């Protein structure tokens, strides 16, 4: 690897396990950590350990939590008949930042992707079906990414859930705020026209 002391080499290697962290960035981070005062290093160590040891999936929705069920599932002010289906826990956080959705969530932990060998059985669909049948869900908002895999997952969910009398909706997508039409691709423009609404 390099002529650095073994502990630094191990730290660089460990940091490079993180997504988006290449060898150079891992090296910079390692040297930054080595130069940090002991209190901050201990805080970092504790935060890493706690995140790994004390965070788990909610038994109801599969969102990441440190209590079971999670605070969203426990919140009685939320509409229990409305579930937003997302790919992973980061999507829950993104939607919650908007502070507009007042239903509950279900985290699929992925999307259907035959190219990656991920089929419906690899997703958290059984738990979703159990919730739909046991909790009286009336609407499912599918909030998977607008990709081929996200669309395939949305279509599969629609076929699976619609026969149960549950309304299945999809998040609208199209042009971003502040975007220029001239830079939009054809698919985005098509979806923007399909999702248009009356003013």
From Swiss-Prot:
Keyword DNA repair appears in the UniProt entry: yes
GO terms classed as biological process: DNA recombination; DNA repair
Protein name as catalogued: Recombination protein RecR
Family: Belongs to the RecR family.
Record-linked SUPFAM superfamilies: Recombination protein RecR
Keyword Zinc among record annotations: yes
Highest taxon listed in the record's lineage: Bacteria
PANTHER family membership: RECOMBINATION PROTEIN RECR
MF annotations from Gene Ontology: DNA binding; zinc ion binding
Signal peptide limits: none
Keyword terms, alphabetized: DNA damage, DNA recombination, DNA repair, Metal-binding, Zinc, Zinc-finger
HAMAP family per UniProt: RecR
InterPro entries assigned: DNA_Rcmb_RecR, Rcmb_RecR, Rcmb_RecR_Znf, TOPRIM_dom, TOPRIM_RecR
Function: May play a role in DNA repair. It seems to be involved in an RecBC-independent recombinational process of DNA repair. It may act with RecF and RecO.
């Amino acid at each position: 690897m390099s002529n650095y002391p073994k502990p630094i080499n191990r730290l660089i290697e460990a940091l490079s396990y993180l997504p988006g962290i290449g060898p150079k960035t891992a090296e910079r981070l390692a040297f930054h950590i080595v130069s940090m005062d002991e209190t901050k290093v201990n805080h970092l160590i504790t935060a890493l350990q706690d995140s790994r040891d004390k965070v788990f999936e909610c038994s109801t929705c599969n969102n990441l939590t440190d209590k079971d069920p999670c605070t969203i599932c426990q919140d009685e002010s939320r509409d229990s008949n409305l579930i937003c289906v997302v790919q992973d826990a980061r999507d829950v956080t993104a939607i919650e930042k908007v502070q507009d959705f007042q239903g509950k969530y279900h985290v699929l932990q992925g999307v259907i992707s035959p190219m990656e060998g991920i089929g419906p059985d690899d997703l958290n669909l059984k738990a979703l079906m159990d919730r739909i049948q046991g909790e009286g869900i009336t609407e499912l908002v599918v909030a998977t990414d607008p990709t081929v895999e996200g669309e395939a997952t949305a279509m599969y969910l629609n076929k699976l859930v619609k026969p149960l009398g549950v309304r299945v909706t999809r998040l609208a997508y199209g042009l971003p705020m502040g975007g220029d039409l001239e830079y939009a691709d054809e698919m985005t423009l098509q979806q923007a026209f399909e999702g248009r609404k009356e003013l």
